[in-house]
Regions:
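Glycan-association/targeting regions that enable binding to alpha-glucans and other polysaccharides
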Residues: 1-134
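Carbohydrate-binding surface patches
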Residues: 16, 28, 553-587
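Active-site-proximal helices and loops of the catalytic beta/alpha 8
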Residues: 240-249, 257-258, 263-274, 328, ...
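Aromatic/acidic polysaccharide-binding cleft in carbohydrate-active enzymes
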Residues: 139, 383-384, 436-471, 487-525
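C-terminal accessory region downstream of the catalytic core in glycan-modifying enzymes
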Residues: 521-542, 585-606, 615-617
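C-terminal beta-strand-rich structural cap/linker in extracellular carbohydrate-active enzymes
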Residues: 35, 605-626
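Substrate-binding/active-site clefts of carbohydrate-active enzymes
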Residues: 137-202, 209-335, 356-362, 379
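Conserved, mostly hydrophobic/aromatic
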Residues: 31, 136, 196, 206, ...
């Protein structure tokens, strides 16, 4: 049975400092078993993940605190990045032992170890975690004119009606080929920079912009050419210049695990004038791919033959993407990009990611490297390898899918403590710089629209039904109320709040392609958009929301209250996700507070603020500590 009074890895009474620690630093452990249980010795037993070495350290009986004996020890963390999996062995004077792990006391059974992340402390650009990110699917954001797809790679066609639904019905071969385009462009994004600045955006994350046969452009055809339907390299450079003038940076999507079968590197259909790997074993790109046998059978991303997988360990490929003086990574940083998001980081070797980081630091020292990782990035195992994403010299931050999953569950009737547990686990496991640099989001191009998820009663089983699905007025109202709460939490939680284009405008839609419709210019939900803009303004105005310490105040049932504290300033987010009012006495040993959302003032009585939170409502309380 678990007894947090004996040891709680998240309490500084038991372990200090909290969470992950830099290489070579000291970690103090206190274990407090009941004195009557007769333990005379306590040993910390730790296993190093990467070397396999076992560490044993004796904790010494230091004092008796009431009914408990306190054992204390100081561990020096390894000098190299590592994951330590530890538990305690307690020994009585008669030689009998007991094991203490995350599940509690163990006599026998599989050990459920605590995790200690040991990382190499490196510089992390602050502009990402301290900013507001806006994700754009370029083909669907803003069209200035109807493009002509004639002569471009892929059998493309363009919707004349911007408000059409993206094609989802398979062709006669049973494939959805994503060849329908809407004509959004880089110049269209540039034309909307003032709107984005007014929304509070400081970082643009663009889905792939390089020449590709498909509208999503994840099947890259030419890494060094902007897709002509989006514009030119000069258009990209101008976008970056104009964005910089408004305090906005641009991050690009790097798809480096696979290319398109119609790319100039593979060239399966002979579209490009050069010789691709599918055309000749003498192709300069032949060694980039793994054939068995050539030319029809080859490794492909998840077995999708239009996405041939590249061999990242091939020196020529690494030179092209990373090492060369005009490599893909370096070229686009010099053209104005401020960072890269690595698509499918699990598919890339650790040393490949580390080389990208090095090339970025050499080319643009303040650039940011983000990774697509769907789980806890410190415990992720891919292809039987424990990954080192956040241990130093790889990723600065990752996409925070666990945040989205936990937040949706809470807002749809789950327990606030489950949300706390999910995020507190990440906070404990991640280096603090990485936790503050997480890309927190409510939706992306790979997830259903957040308004639909929060408003719908259930997910239709049939894709045709999902294509035709629209929230009823009652469902939409509930969804909007929940979405306002989701945005409140998103913008006040540690990490970079990220808005998927159109979520702030109340766009609906299930999965791809229904979540990738054209932005509804002049048809937005202006109230919701103003709410997002106001939250972004608060985040910009109060540094505490960017780097402040996180405190959990109340996490029970439908009530979620957490605070951020920095340099004497305190902001608390209070949310009631229930369909009924909730009354509580909020502990508040501080001066009177003001709700930034309504201007209402609250005066504490006996170090508490009496609150009644209406159904599906929230507050953002601000005060200055004495």
């Amino acid at each position: 049975m678990r007894d947090p009074f004996v040891f709680d890895s998240r309490s500084e009474f038991c372990k200090k400092p909290f969470g992950a620690v830099p290489c070579g630093s000291e970690v103090v452990f206190h274990v407090r078993p009941l004195t009557r249980d007769g333990y005379s010795r306590c040993v910390l037993v730790a296993r190093r993940e990467f070397s396999g070495e076992e560490i044993q350290m004796e904790l010494l009986p230091e004092a008796v605190d009431g009914e408990r004996t306190r054992f204390t020890g100081v561990l020096t963390a390894p000098s190299e990045p590592e994951l330590l999996w530890y538990h305690f062995r307690l020994i009585r004077s008669d030689g009998s032992t007991a094991l203490l792990d995350q599940s509690g006391w163990q006599e026998t059974g599989e050990i459920q170890s605590w995790q200690l992340t040991v990382y190499e402390k490196t510089a992390t650009p602050l502009w990402f975690g301290g900013g507001v990110v806006y994700q754009i699917f370029p083909d669907r954001f803003c069209r200035l004119s109807l493009p002509d797809p004639t002569g471009l790679v892929g059998n493309r066609w363009v919707h004349e009606n911007w408000n059409d639904q993206p094609v989802w019905v398979p062709d006669p071969d049973g494939e959805v080929r994503n060849r329908d385009f809407f004509g959004g462009s880089l110049n269209g994004i540039t034309a909307k920079l003032d709107d984005l600045a007014a929304l509070g955006v400081t970082v643009l994350y663009l889905n792939p912009i390089f020449e590709s046969a498909s509208n999503h452009r994840y099947n890259t055809a030419d890494y060094l050419r902007i897709d002509p339907m989006l514009g030119t390299e000069e258009d990209f450079r101008r976008l970056c210049r104009e964005a910089k003038q408004r305090g906005i940076r641009v991050i690009l999507d790097g798809v480096f695990n696979h290319t398109g079968s119609q790319s100039r590197y593979f060239n399966a259909d002979g579209f490009y004038p050069g010789v691709g790997a599918a055309q000749s074993t003498d192709s300069p790109y032949f060694n980039w791919f793994s054939f068995h046998p050539w030319p029809t059978d080859y490794d492909a991303w998840w077995g999708i033959m239009t996405l041939p997988a590249v061999q990242e360990n091939e020196p020529d490929y690494r030179d092209f993407i990373i090492r060369g003086q005009d490599s893909v990574v370096r070229h686009w940083l010099r053209a104005g990009a401020s960072g890269w998001r690595l698509d499918g980081a699990d598919e890339l070797p650790d040393d490949f990611i580390a080389e990208i980081r090095t090339a970025m630091e050499e080319t643009a020292p303040d650039s940011f490297l983000l990774g697509e990782v769907w789980e806890d990035a410190t415990t992720k195992v891919a292809y039987s390898q424990r990954r080192r994403y956040l241990l130093g010299h790889e990723l600065h931050g990752v996409m925070n899918y666990p945040f989205r999953t936990a937040l949706i569950a809470y807002l749809r009737g789950g327990d606030a403590d489950d949300f706390r547990e999910t995020l507190e686990t990440l906070r404990e496991n991640y280096p603090p710089e990485a936790f503050l640099s997480l890309m927190n989001f409510l939706g992306t191009h790979d997830t259903p629209r957040i308004l639909t998820v929060l408003g719908a009663d259930n997910v239709p089983d049939n894709k045709a039904d999902r294509a035709a699905y629209r929230l009823s007025p009652a469902q939409r109202q509930i969804g909007l109320e929940r979405l306002r709460l989701a945005a409140l939490i998103l913008f006040t939680f540690p990490g970079a709040p990220t808005v998927y284009y159109g979520d702030e405008a109340a766009m609906e839609g299930w999965e791809d392609p229904f979540n990738r419709a054209g932005y509804p210019w002049a048809q937005e939900d202006t109230d919701l958009k103003a709410h997002f803009a106001e939250l972004a303004r608060f985040r910009r105005s109060f540094p505490v929301l960017q780097t402040g310490e996180l405190h959990w105040i109340w996490t029970s049932g439908s009530i979620l209250i957490f605070a951020r504290e920095l340099d004497g300033q305190l902001l608390a987010t209070a949310v009631n996700a229930a369909d009924v009012p909730q009354t509580l006495s909020l502990p508040w040993p501080a001066p009177p507070a003001r709700d930034l959302l309504t201007g209402q003032c609250f005066t504490p009585v006996d170090n508490a603020i009496p609150l009644t939170l209406p159904p599906r409502s929230g507050l953002l309380l601000q005060t200055d500590l004495p």
